[in-house]
Amino acid sequence: MKLILRADVENLGSLGDVVDVKPGYGRNFLLPQGLAMVASQANLKVFEQERKKLQAHMDALRAEAQDMQARLEALDVVITMHVGDNDKLYGSVTTTIIGDAIAALGVDVDRRRILMDAPIRTLGEHPVRVRLHPSVIALVPVKVVSDHQSFEEEPAPEAPAEEAEAAE
């Protein structure tokens, strides 16, 4: 089945490409989603008239994704997890946890856009990819820390402050 793509489709092509796909993929996904139209002489003429409008829309989406990429890459995402002996995590850091941590910093990202080969199971800093657009992928630094570290670090600054008040 020959189709004209009306948008960039991952692993298939970009706006304006004439592609040959299996009939089921075209009928059940691309056509109902408005991502493609049947490649006929009449549709080619119609598409050429729509091309500039569609291209402007795609460029606007790409620019918005690049702005979001800059905001995401500037974030310091810290996830506190419970650990056991030898700094081994109880459970793992999944896309849902990362998505919630990013949302807590004020940027909403759909967890399905977070790309991970496997859940994070170790402490430390891990780069996590977020697909914002077919051509824009942000690398977000995610730091996984122990919940024991955060409790140990907090009381230390309070002790000198209490001593200073007692000295007065």
From Swiss-Prot:
Protein name per the record: Large ribosomal subunit protein bL9
PROSITE patterns: RIBOSOMAL_L9 (PS00651)
Function, as annotated: Binds to the 23S rRNA.
Highest taxon, organism lineage: Bacteria
NCBIfam families: L9
Family: Belongs to the bacterial ribosomal protein bL9 family.
Biological process according to GO: translation
Protein's UniProt keywords contain Ribonucleoprotein: yes
Ranges annotated as biased composition (Acidic residues): 152-168
Chain segments carrying region Disordered: 149-168
Organism field: Desulfovibrio desulfuricans (strain ATCC 27774 / DSM 6949 / MB)
Transmembrane domains' residue ranges: none
Gene Ontology MF terms: rRNA binding; structural constituent of ribosome
Keywords: Ribonucleoprotein, Ribosomal protein, RNA-binding, rRNA-binding
GO terms for cellular component: ribonucleoprotein complex; ribosome
Family matches, as Pfam families: Ribosomal_L9_C, Ribosomal_L9_N
Acyltransferase listed as a keyword: no
